Amino acid sequence: MNPITMKLVVDDLILQALREDITFEDVSTASVCPTARPATVELIAKADGIIAGLDVFARTFELLDPQSSVLFDVSDGDEVHAGDHVGQVRGDARVLLSGERVALNYLQRMSGIATYTHRMVAALEGTKTVLVDTRKTTPGMRVFEKAAVEIGGGSNHRYNLSTAVMLKDNHIDAAGGVARAIEMARAHASFTTTVEIECENLGMVREAVEAGADIIMFDNMTHDDMAAAVELIAGRAKTECSGNVDANNIRALADLGVDFISSGALTHSAPILDLSLKHLRLLDGK
């Protein structure tokens, strides 16, 4: 992540996670390390996958003690295998022990998302289709989870509700129809704001094209209807399909010729990548 995002957004989130975990005192660490003692601990991969979130991992220790340092053997986006040495953390043993869980939580979560995304993107090779995420993220984790999607080779859909207009079924109901919803969005939003609308059938797609939507999402439409919708739109709007996307069907969806495939599973269903901090070694000889 860029330094500005790290300072303005990420630091506060990491500190909140540390406060949640440590609160008043790490009683286990205080019991065995009552005073500062220099130490190292090794970061080891326990499964195969794509690494993501190294800067967040390191920053977790730095926020506890600016004198902490991390030396990595890999970079974000690199593939690791079970047993690989990923890096070494150096600093006060109390900091290494107290920050371990929060730092690993971020790294495991982000690496899991990057690994899952990488697998899905590989299925799209040779097509024009771009895999994008959704807002189905863990509360308080969006900035990390969306960064992990990008590291895994995917792209980000809108970051939040202010980024773009996305008219869903309830918006359409509130406006009184597809065309009216698009008309109202154009009247309210800046001319620079993209207007996307969710369609459930070909009739809605036809109305959305005629009303001038920028992006038309096919939400849980049948394969045949989506193929017909792409032909109907004929390049007059960008196309996106969504709903129950997985590694088994993503290629068939891309072969329809859609511009984007969105998948909430990238962030809500990706398993963590198992990583561990092992072999803490005290450096003071005591």
Question: What does each of the following model-derived ranges do?
Answer:
Residues D219, A237-C241, R281-K286:
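Short, structured secondary-structure boundary patches
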Residues M1-I4, D284-K286:
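Basic/polar N-terminal segments that are highly enriched at the extreme N-terminus
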Residues A265-K286:
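Short, charged, intrinsically disordered terminal tails
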